[in-house]
Amino acid sequence: METLNLFVRSIFIDNMVFAFFFGMCSYIAVSKSVKTAMGLGAAVIFVMAMTVPLNYLLNEYVLAPNALVEGVDLSFLTFIVFIAVIASFVQLVEMVVEKFSPSLYNQLGIFLPLIAVNCAIMGGSLFMQQKVVAGEIDSLFQSIVYGLGSGLGWAIAIVMMAAIRERLQYSHIPAGLKGPGIAFIITGLMGIAFMIFSGIQL
């Protein structure tokens, strides 16, 4: 039940976009089309589902104080190691997408490799580390669940935004609010709507 609660919280309550406003650059830029948003969302789910558990293992058995050698604390390498792991998986995703879906690769453009520095993905690993200290994550399986849930939450957010923005193309929006302006307002409203999930315990 704790694992299910962790999964639900990572999607709805601790949503990377609506709760922390992480990954906003690609969220705003790529959310103009549902198809493109789904492609980037799938890439983010994969990268987070892979990197969070891998970073969990590195944190537990290499970086944590006394993990590798008694009396040695390598936690100062956390950011470098986490970013290296994330960048490696993003490179793998980029090669796969370019090989099997050139059209999606061209639509995503620079934002696909930019997943490597997407603060939502880095945030997932850092929040995982925080939850390990707090005792909310205490196994590899729970880290996989958290990574998958966090990625799914971000993907749901960008697909919802893309669906709304596709409809907005046929609406009369004041000139000053067109583009990112209205997108930020809608994101704020959706964030408020997602607050209804706060306090849910399974």
Where are these regions (language model features)?
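Hydrophobic core segments of alpha-helical transmembrane domains in multi-pass membrane transport
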Residues: 22-26, 44-50, 83-92, 117-124, ...
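Juxtamembrane transmembrane-helix termini in multi-pass membrane transport proteins
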Residues: 5-46
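Generic transmembrane alpha-helix signature in multi-pass membrane proteins
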Residues: 21-29, 94-100, 111-114, 119-135
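Ordered, amphipathic secondary-structure segments that act as subunit-interaction surfaces
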Residues: 60-108
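Cytoplasmic-side transmembrane-helix entry/capping segments in multi-pass membrane proteins
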Residues: 36-46, 77-82, 104-115, 176-182
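C-terminal ends of transmembrane helices
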Residues: 22-36, 90-104, 161-172
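Structural signature of hydrophobic alpha-helical transmembrane segments
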Residues: 5-19, 72-86, 144-157
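Interfacial loop-to-transmembrane junctions
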Residues: 166-185
